[in-house]
Swiss-Prot record:
Binding annotation for S-adenosyl-L-methionine: 76, 108
Gene name of the encoded protein: rlmH
Protein name in UniProt: Ribosomal RNA large subunit methyltransferase H
Source organism of this protein record: Limosilactobacillus reuteri (strain DSM 20016)
Subunit structure: Homodimer.
EC number per UniProt: 2.1.1.177
Length: 159
């Protein structure tokens, strides 16, 4: 099974990289895990709404270029649906049981995801109403995907 996270911009901070590398290593037992980075657009503070929409649209096109038709896509969105870790694990298990072997998660850039990306998504996941930095979101999501596999496989990691 293939799990892909698409993120906007390069991850620079060593501590995020180290955390993600740890979960990527652990996930190697359960799936082919990859993180795909697409270039971000400059988004200075002074942008108008139209300019912000353009930034999201451009980043969105780059994200959509990395998604194939067969992929089941989760968009990470603050206003999406919240789940518990157990519910998420059940959902992943069900998707694989019903033949989805390519699952892709999309995290927006500093301004968020474009309407086109949200439209392509098969489901939206919210990690609550807090706004998390997109780099940190990659780490938190990697951990939750790992947690889901430990739940599916009955390992004692999840309490
Ligand atoms: C800095 S946030 C963008 C904030 C933007 N105002 C928005 O509402 O999307 C960057 C990305 O991280 C992800 N993200 C941040 N907090 C999240 C949360 N609580 N739940 C789900 N995704 C989140 C989303 O993919 C978002 O597009």
């Amino acid at each position: 099974m293939n799990i892909k996270i698409i993120g906007v911009g390069k991850l620079k901070e060593k501590y995020f990289k180290a955390g993600i590398a740890e979960y990527a290593k652990r996930l190697g037992r359960y799936c082919k895990f990859e993180i795909v980075e697409v270039p971000d657009e400059k988004a200075p503070e002074s942008l108008s709404q139209a300019e912000m929409d353009e930034v999201m649209a451009k980043e969105g096109e780059r994200i959509l270029d990395k998604i194939k038709d067969r992929e089941y896509v989760y968009a990470l969105a603050i206003k999406g649906k919240e789940r518990s870790s157990e519910e998420f694990a059940k959902e992943i298990n069900k998707l694989t049981t019903y033949g989805h072997s390519d699952i892709t998660f999309v995290i927006g850039g500093s301004l968020g995801l474009s309407p086109a990306v949200l439209k392509r998504a098969d489901a939206q996941i919210s990690f609550g109403r807090f706004t998390l930095p997109h780099q940190l979101m990659r780490l938190v999501l990697s951990e939750q995907i790992y947690r889901a596999f430990t739940i599916i496989n009955g390992l004692p990691y999840h309490k």
